Amino acid sequence: MATIFYAEPELVIGHNRKILFVNPNDLQIFKEIELPTDLLSSCGLKSSSTSTAEQQSAAAETGGGSVVEGEEPKDTKTIEAGASASAPTVSVQNVSYSPDRQLLAVTTAGQKALVLYKCRPEHAQLVSVRALARASSAIRFAADSSSVLVTDKTGDCYQYDCIETEALPRLLLGHLSIVYDILWTGDQQHIITSDRDDKIRVTNYPATFDIHSYCLGHKEFVSGLALLSDEHICSVSGDKTLRVWNFKAGKELLRTDLPAPAVRLHHRQLPQKSDGDNADNLQRHQLGILFYDHVDAVGLYELEGNGDVWSVTVSQQIRADAGSWNICNFALTEERVYVMGAKDERLTFRCYNSSNGEPITSQLPEGWLTMILDQFPGDAGSCLPEDLSVWFKKRFDNVSDYLERKKRRIEEQQQQHKC
């Protein structure tokens, strides 16, 4: 899965086995990470869930979670060190910076692993590689950067220690469907998760067996969350709505209709306004939303809030030539929106002005796109966007035929009684 995000002052691009760190102003690459082709075997690990399942089962006994007895690991084949020819391909799945910008967490697909790097100005130092039982769906660091949460596509959430890297992962909580996004509050007392079954769950930490509240109201998958304050979050969903919640009370505070289902959410806090009587209490946030299959590919919204009163003050749509290429992700900076996608199944990028939604061409250095794409030659540059249609609920009508047969049977019985 191709990924891109902005972590001031860097634009981070992840695709295939490479992660690029780019200056968002002149688009010069100043650092890169390339994952080994045989990631797990090169670190003496097995590419399977066998060893990981044993670790996670032991961790669950002390981690506030449980493991279903008799559950067989999904992956049973192992790959010994040196058998790299038969190893699954490695590709970047999720990338996240720690709040102190000292650590970078990467989860991979193919050979499923959590890779931890210590970041330096000119290079990144590998800290640990830990095998995952299942493909990850989201990752999130603790506010103090001491641990990282990893959710997988079966709905489980594990905590991995970033200091004691040999420590076993701890199973914290589980959903009955895939978790699309996860938040961890600044005081580390609540973990907030959203899933395919329309739910936003607020779980107490560290006693994760205790659910604090639910934020209910969405009618489709909840694809993105953003933490607005110590008590407020916003969410976007496939039901074409943006909502603001008081997550501690489980109360909906604002609902705004969107032009299309939302599949990605990026958030940036804005400086407070200097004028006005309530300027000190007024919070301002910018939200970037990627839409599913819509002429307006990306929507930009500004939120203002004072206490439990929130409103959308500004909105801007960016068409990004939607329909001419497959858009899979984007990054939101102060003045620009960098859009990532595939054209003719090859990776490409485009840049737009966040204030008016127009393409930026004259302000970008010549050859910037070629310079970035040259880092992904040959098969490394191939890009097949994820089929997001599977995110939507499939509804099957298995009652209408039964009711029709029942109706005919009753009518026949009534006719027989008349005769």
From Swiss-Prot:
GO terms for biological process: oogenesis; spermatogenesis; tRNA (guanine-N7)-methylation. It comes from the Eukaryota. GO terms for cellular component: cytosol; female germ cell nucleus; male germ cell nucleus; nucleus; tRNA methyltransferase complex. InterPro entries: Trm82, WD40/YVTN_repeat-like_dom_sf, WD40_repeat_CS, WD40_rpt. Keywords: Cytoplasm, Developmental protein, Differentiation, Nucleus, Oogenesis, Repeat, Spermatogenesis, tRNA processing, WD repeat. PROSITE patterns: WD_REPEATS_1, WD_REPEATS_2, WD_REPEATS_REGION. WD repeats lie at residues 87-127, 174-213, 217-255. Residues 51-61 have a biased composition (Low complexity). Pathway: tRNA modification; N(7)-methylguanine-tRNA biosynthesis. Residues 51-75 are annotated as: Disordered. It is found in: Nucleus; Cytoplasm. HAMAP family: TRM82. Belongs to the WD repeat TRM82 family. Wuho means 'no progeny' in Chinese. Required for the Mettl1-dependent formation of N(7)-methylguanine at position 46 (m7G46) in tRNA. In the Mettl1-wuho methyltransferase complex, it is required to stabilize and induce conformational changes of the catalytic subunit. Required for binding of nanos mRNA and repression of translation by the mei-P26-bgcn-bam-sxl complex. May cooperate with mei-P26 and nanos to derepress the BMP signaling pathway. May cooperate with mei-P26 to suppress expression of a subset of microRNAs. May cooperate with mei-P26 to regulate bam expression levels in germline cells during gametogenesis. This is tRNA (guanine-N(7)-)-methyltransferase non-catalytic subunit wuho. The gene is wuho.
